[in-house]
Amino acid sequence: MAGITFLDKTRVGWWKNGFPPYYTRIPKAADWSRINLRLIDEELDLAGWDVDSFNRRLDMKEGISYRDMEVTSPRGNQLRIHVEHITNMARPNLCLIKYSVSSINYTGRISLVPILDGNIVDDADLPNLKIWNILRSGSTSSCAYLWTQTRREDAQVCYAMTYQFFKNNKETTANPIRIEKEKQTGFSVGADVKPGDNVTLIKYTAIASSLYHERSELVEHSVAEALEVKSIGWNTLIEEHRRAWQEIWDETDVVIEGDPEAQQGIRYNIFQLYQTYRGDDPRLNIGPKGFTGEKYGGNTYWNTELCCVPFFLLSTPKEIAKNLLAYRHNQLPKAIENARKLGFKDGAALFPQVTNNGEECHSEWE
């Protein structure tokens, strides 16, 4: 999704010479991570069920987030849930979730429903602004996909998802129920359980964008990649992911002695930097909030050169810092155009304060 942008019309109560007509933003992605949990007549809802225990943690060393909980449904059914979630650093187009449910006192059917959800709600200034169109969604017996397109810039992204399902650590091959709606696609798969039994679903999602692939090939490419990584399997993929993070920490870790809070803080900053920017594409950059939320639209500010380049310059191969600077250099023609709008000439360059594509996206310059 990095590098995919959307042009949002500038809205101000006054207008000055040089104001940009559009504000670029990185659009919020479709929800590839959704997995619903259903019993015979109930569906997991943490707002309506009793949460007997809950723990969520992030292992920054290995790049894995965990969530553990014990819950009781309104009908008294008790479950223990364990979730592992990664965005793969060794295969950056791949996202994985392992979702495990154990019955404490429940007898009946447990269904897990992995979904690709295109019902996107933005948290930014205009939550009702429609950014994505659904070009096509569909499924086969083993894979589902959601093909999307931004409304103005015609950038496209395709998500493809497949899964493995286990009961008591043994893979099952029961035929799933296909879910095909206008903006959702996926499967429902389940098993009958008694107290002490457990079921596990591993969800493999591959994401392909028009930044790297021909639009006509996005569905084929993402589906093929999802099926390929399923054949490789969770254990191998997660070991690749762990090794990738180990190489990052061996290269960039900062050790602070005697201050555990500062130590955790600096490592969290490093973790978020690498979650946002890998350094292998000079068309990409780092927004002030990384990919932690929608603030600032994911745009690049001057903070990159001030705050991020020094870190990468001192701790990583020179190509990474070089690519960050190449990002600016490649936008020189737009910087000259920006200066011309304000009356400058003879090749004067005004690099933008806020941008994704080289055009100034901020209405007031600092």
List each model region and its residues.
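Substrate-binding groove/exosite segments of carbohydrate-active enzymes
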Residues: N235-E366
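Acidic/polar, glycine-enriched structural segments that form the non-catalytic walls/loops
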Residues: M1-Y296
